Regions:
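Secondary-structure end/capping motifs
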Residues: 83-156
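Short secondary-structure transition/capping segments
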Residues: 54-56, 72-73, 135-136, 168-172
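Pocket-lining segment of extracytoplasmic ligand-binding domains
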Residues: 22-23, 27-113
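Conserved C-terminal helix/tail region of periplasmic/extracytoplasmic solute-binding proteins
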Residues: 150-175
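Hinge/capping helix and adjacent helix->loop/strand transition within the periplasmic-binding protein
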Residues: 3-21, 28, 83-87
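A short linear boundary/processing microfeature
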Residues: 1, 12, 55-58, 116, ...
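A local structural motif
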Residues: 11-26, 36-39, 122-124, 155-163
Length: 175
């Protein structure tokens, strides 16, 4: 998805995508590759942006090329599994949303979890830009990503986001 976001940003800013050669560099190695001149630009993510400090310069927000707000992560299951396990699926969704609400309102505590689980420097964790986690999945927030995938041929045909979002029945949602 990172390359598609980059391509979309470049396209919106008038770049000729045929003149650009993309190379895969692991996220933790991007700042070094930039410093050594091995790449001209990189799509970096937090906490690596903050850790790089003034060694890198922001050219633009590739994710912003998709939409001002959109869904950037998701969890997927087959229709057959969801139909066979609707209660488990509903509990999973509730747990994810409950965690998102907690993380959005407990920045200090969630940063401490990042420090422990990702072995992140506490100073970096306190300074980095944090995402706001979605607390409900709305088709309007997923559609820009679906459209990007369609635009670049990842999907064989256009698709409506509301067709791929599972919603628990009211009885299962309350269980």
């Amino acid at each position: 998805q990172a390359q598609l976001e980059s391509e979309l940003w470049l396209e919106k800013h008038g770049a000729d995508l045929k003149s650009i050669h993309f190379v895969e560099v692991p996220f933790p190695e991007m700042a070094g590759a930039l410093e050594r001149g091995q790449v001209a630009a990189a799509l970096m993510v937090e906490p690596l942006i903050t850790a790089a400090g003034d060694k890198v310069r922001m050219l633009g927000d590739a994710m912003g090329a998709i939409a001002p707000q959109f869904v950037s992560t998701g969890w997927f299951a087959s229709d057959a599994w969801v139909q066979a396990n609707p209660d488990v699926a509903a509990r999973f969704v509730r747990a994810i949303l409950r965690t998102a609400r907690w993380a959005n309102t407990h920045h200090t505590q969630s940063a401490q979890i990042l420090v422990r689980s990702a072995k992140l420097d506490p100073v970096i964790a306190s300074k980095m830009t944090r995402s706001t986690y979605g607390t409900k999945l709305e088709p309007a927030l997923l559609q820009p990503v679906v459209d990007m995938f369609s635009h670049f041929g990842v999907l064989s045909k256009p698709m409506r986001a509301d067709e791929i979002i599972w919603t628990a029945s009211p009885a299962v949602a309350r269980s």
